[in-house]
């Protein structure tokens, strides 16, 4: 009996020979399938992260647009001619010069 077991290869050797010998194509295809599945998972994860980042940026853009509109309104209110003129008279004692005191300078 010892002669029979010595002449027969072990089960692990047979499995190894089967996978790397006869089933080499199947092993390569299995590795390719696993790599492809990992690639799909990574691509899906990156897409979800970028979608969340895009939504956050759109929310920030909306907030900044509202702030911009408020600043434009404030600027137009502060730059209104009658307000500037009234403040210059009140705070700086400025007044419009009489037409006879105006001097016109001609440039070449």
UniProtKB/Swiss-Prot annotation:
Does this UniProt record's set of keywords contain Cell cycle?
Answer: yes
* UniProt membrane topology term: Single-pass type II membrane protein
Give UniProt keywords alphabetically: Cell cycle, Cell division, Cell inner membrane, Cell membrane, Membrane, Transmembrane, Transmembrane helix
The superkingdom of the source organism is: Bacteria
Compartments, record wording:
Cell inner membrane
Q: What does this protein do?
A: Essential cell division protein. May link together the upstream cell division proteins, which are predominantly cytoplasmic, with the downstream cell division proteins, which are predominantly periplasmic.
Q: What is this protein called?
A: Cell division protein FtsL
In the UniProt record, the gene name given for this protein reads ftsL
